[in-house]
């Protein structure tokens, strides 16, 4: 485990230690704090999992929203592309390059698994300008089929659903969705989607599925920014029609920070954590 924040590092260590204890103590967990110890943390690694945020929510994420808004540019998430994504990339790419330089020296054959946004910009920078093998990942792939089925009122059982997903980092397509017997679920999904009348959180994604034939992995908030069809200053009625939550990410961050502070002690002191 590596972090530049000793408190966050200790919290992560406590939780992983509890998990390890409850799963048979099969892992050896070591911690490294501070930039001066980064090379030691990476030395000999086969994989490096990256999940960082440069600049924190306050002030940087706030700035990513407030500056564009001042000039009439509205956003929902602002962590992948557009003005907010560019801001985030400009402050994060230099840190990623530092990671890469260290990895080239102490673990040149390791895979860099990136969970940090802006996904495409950061992964692209690593692939173009470093010698480190890099893959961009997002948890949306794991929950894609479940979110679609629940949106249209169909049951989701992990053991009964098969999904084939492909695409670029942070923007992939659900190419196939079947039950365990190979029956295509898309026809029934699309039939039910066409009958929905109440507003819901997946309206942008269902509109994309209607137009292109396939469901996308990323949320409606993300896709409202990815495509130039939804957030239009000349057509503000689209915001309401597709239930697009402008300024969603700052609200989400505030709630997540509050939830984390509330749950932190419970998690780190829970002897049955697994």
Q: What are these regions, as identified by a protein language model?
A:
Residues 1-62, 77-78, 85-156, 169-174, ...:
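Metallocofactor- and cofactor-centric catalytic cores in central/energy metabolism, strongly enriched
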Residues 153-274:
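Long, compositionally biased stretches enriched for glycine and/or charged residues
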């Amino acid at each position: 485990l590596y972090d530049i924040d000793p408190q966050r590092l200790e919290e992560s260590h406590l939780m992983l230690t509890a998990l390890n204890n409850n799963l048979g103590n099969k892992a050896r967990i070591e911690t490294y704090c501070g930039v001066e110890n980064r090379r030691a943390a990476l030395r000999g690694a086969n994989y490096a999992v990256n999940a960082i945020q440069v600049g924190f929510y306050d002030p940087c994420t706030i700035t990513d929203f407030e500056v564009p808004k001042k000039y009439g540019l509205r956003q929902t998430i602002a962590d992948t592309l557009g003005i907010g994504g560019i801001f985030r990339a400009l402050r994060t790419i230099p840190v990623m390059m530092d990671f890469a330089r260290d990895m080239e020296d102490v673990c040149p054959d390791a895979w860099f698994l990136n969970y940090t946004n802006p996904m495409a910009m950061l992964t692209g920078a690593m692939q173009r300008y470093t010698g480190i093998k890099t893959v961009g990942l997002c948890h949306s792939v794991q929950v894609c089929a479940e979110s679609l089925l629940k949106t249209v009122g169909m049951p989701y059982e992990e053991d009964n659903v098969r999904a084939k997903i492909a695409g670029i980092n942070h923007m992939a397509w659900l190419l196939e969705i079947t039950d365990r017997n190979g029956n295509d679920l898309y026809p029934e999904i699309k039939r039910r989607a066409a009958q929905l009348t109440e507003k819901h959180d997946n309206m942008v994604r269902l509109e994309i599925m209607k137009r292109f034939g396939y469901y996308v992995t990323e949320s409606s908030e993300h896709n409202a920014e990815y495509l130039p069809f939804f957030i239009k200053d000349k057509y503000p009625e689209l915001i309401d029609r597709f239930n697009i939550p402008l300024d969603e990410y700052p609200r989400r961050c505030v709630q997540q920070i509050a939830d984390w502070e509330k749950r932190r002690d419970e998690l780190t002191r829970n002897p049955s954590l697994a």
